[in-house]
Swiss-Prot record:
<keyword id="KW-0808">Transferase</keyword>
<dbReference type="GO" id="GO:0000287">
    <property type="term" value="F:magnesium ion binding"/>
</dbReference>
<dbReference type="GO" id="GO:0005737">
    <property type="term" value="C:cytoplasm"/>
</dbReference>
<keyword id="KW-0963">Cytoplasm</keyword>
<feature type="binding site">
    <location>
        <position position="8"/>
    </location>
    <ligand>
        <name>Mg(2+)</name>
    </ligand>
</feature>
<dbReference type="InterPro" id="IPR037143">
    <property type="entry name" value="4-PPantetheinyl_Trfase_dom_sf"/>
</dbReference>
<dbReference type="InterPro" id="IPR002582">
    <property type="entry name" value="ACPS"/>
</dbReference>
<keyword id="KW-0276">Fatty acid metabolism</keyword>
<comment type="similarity">
    <text>Belongs to the P-Pant transferase superfamily. AcpS family.</text>
</comment>
<comment type="function">
    <text>Transfers the 4'-phosphopantetheine moiety from coenzyme A to a Ser of acyl-carrier-protein.</text>
</comment>
<dbReference type="InterPro" id="IPR004568">
    <property type="entry name" value="Ppantetheine-prot_Trfase_dom"/>
</dbReference>
<keyword id="KW-0275">Fatty acid biosynthesis</keyword>
<protein>
    <recommendedName>
        <fullName>Holo-[acyl-carrier-protein] synthase</fullName>
        <ecNumber>2.7.8.7</ecNumber>
    </recommendedName>
</protein>
<dbReference type="Pfam" id="PF01648">
    <property type="entry name" value="ACPS"/>
</dbReference>
<dbReference type="GO" id="GO:0006633">
    <property type="term" value="P:fatty acid biosynthetic process"/>
</dbReference>
<dbReference type="InterPro" id="IPR008278">
    <property type="entry name" value="4-PPantetheinyl_Trfase_dom"/>
</dbReference>
<keyword id="KW-0443">Lipid metabolism</keyword>
Length: 128
């Protein structure tokens, strides 16, 4: 049964402006929002702003799917790429919210085209 659905769109230029801005500001943003593995993946790509935008969209979509629980940190939501399709790992308050909802599986899809990155998150389970 579908327990939650979240969708988000991020303008790649918005992330590009942050990355191209003052280095201290860019570093604060990256450290607050992205886990070390996410940063390593994105920084190793030529289109790093697009990759960061897609992951930011995934985090926003996940929060929406979870019903925007209070206190979720960006680092509680990590996009992993194990050679196949990306997956979303929940930790902390995000994982607690998923358990309360009865989530058994998190589905994630990412895409980017025309200067935007889009993510959709579907939460599947039996419910509380």
């Amino acid at each position: 049964m579908i327990l939650g659905l979240g969708l988000d769109v991020v303008e790649v230029a918005r992330i590009q402006r942050i990355l191209a801005g003052p280095p201290a500001r860019a570093e604060r943003f990256l450290a607050r929002v992205f886990a070390p593995a996410e940063r390593a993946y994105c920084d190793a790509r030529q289109d790093r702003a697009t990759r960061y935008a897609a992951r930011f969209a995934a985090k926003e979509a996940a929060v929406k799917a979870l019903g925007t629980p209070e206190g979720v940190r960006w680092l509680d939501l990590v996009v992993e790429r194990g050679g196949g399709a990306p997956s979303l790992v929940l930790d902390g308050i995000a994982a607690d919210a998923a358990r309360r909802l009865g989530v058994a599986r998190v589905h994630l899809t990412l895409t980017h085209d025309g200067g935007v990155a889009v993510a959709a998150v579907i939460l599947e389970g039996t419910g509380p």
